[in-house]
Amino acid sequence: MPYQIENRPPDLRERMYFPEIIRGIGAVTKHFLRNLFFTRDKNPDILERRRGEFGWADNVTLQYPEERAPYPPGYRGLHRLVPREDGRARCVACYMCATACPAQCIYIEAGEYADDPIEKYPVKFVIDELRCIVCGFCVEACPKDAIRMDSGEHTPPSYERGAQIWDEKRLLRGPPVSYQYDPWLRRGSPSIPAEKLEEMRARARPFSTVATDEYAQTPGFSVRALAQEAKDRAERAK
């Protein structure tokens, strides 16, 4: 049942704002004293070096960019496409990541292998990092563990917006990964030599390791332009 609340008019003490002013000064003073006399950095290596240099300096200033604080384990960095052992992308162009993306920043064009018509691969795989809201839905939706955000890198600075649009050449990086349930390991592939296929099967594992590397400096494209180009081709085909 709804009830009505009567709003009383503020008294003189509240209209003068003295309690709020004192409360704000107290909060500023508390943080000032804490930062002046107590440490803010929990890294023991940095703390030990600072104490060795200054003796009393527990309040640590991180000398960026020479010193960088490590990202937490769950940090969502830049995207990367996970490669297979043979260098191809694990992506099968199922469009699940593009469908799950709420920002619609992923554009994919699918193609088929000439020697394996059952499986598809991304002819174009483009991510607009400026539109990305870093929700991680694409990673969760991928059934092949083909896209990850474990690079540990944030978006690099750039003077042009087009430099933040990453294509498949720039995204395909990191250590190769194979799983025991990969279909190309079970049925084989004519384009992969038998020795290489056996090596891939031997290295296949239920879980993969995470590693990072530097991203390739490959120029990207515009996601909207690619989508419009595909739409125009479809209309011309009609």
Swiss-Prot record:
Cofactors that this protein relies on: [4Fe-4S] cluster
Role summary: NDH-1 shuttles electrons from NADH, via FMN and iron-sulfur (Fe-S) centers, to quinones in the respiratory chain. The immediate electron acceptor for the enzyme in this species is believed to be ubiquinone. Couples the redox reaction to proton translocation (for every two electrons transferred, four hydrogen ions are translocated across the cytoplasmic membrane), and thus conserves the redox energy in a proton gradient.
Primary location class: membrane
HAMAP family for the chain: NDH1_NuoI (MF_01351)
Record key words, sorted: 4Fe-4S, Cell inner membrane, Cell membrane, Iron, Iron-sulfur, Membrane, Metal-binding, NAD, Quinone, Repeat, Translocase, Ubiquinone
Catalytic activity from the UniProt record: a quinone + NADH + 5 H(+)(in) = a quinol + NAD(+) + 4 H(+)(out)
Disulfide pairings: none
Keyword Disulfide bond on entry: no
The protein's name in its UniProt record: NADH-quinone oxidoreductase subunit I
PANTHER family per UniProt: NADH DEHYDROGENASE UBIQUINONE IRON-SULFUR PROTEIN 8, MITOCHONDRIAL, NADH-QUINONE OXIDOREDUCTASE SUBUNIT I 2
Residues noted as binding [4Fe-4S] cluster 1 in the record, renumbered to the chain: 91, 94, 97, 142
Membrane topology: Peripheral membrane protein
Binding note for cofactor: Binds 2 [4Fe-4S] clusters per subunit.
An example molecular function term from Gene Ontology annotations: iron ion binding
Subunit field text: NDH-1 is composed of 14 different subunits. Subunits NuoA, H, J, K, L, M, N constitute the membrane sector of the complex.
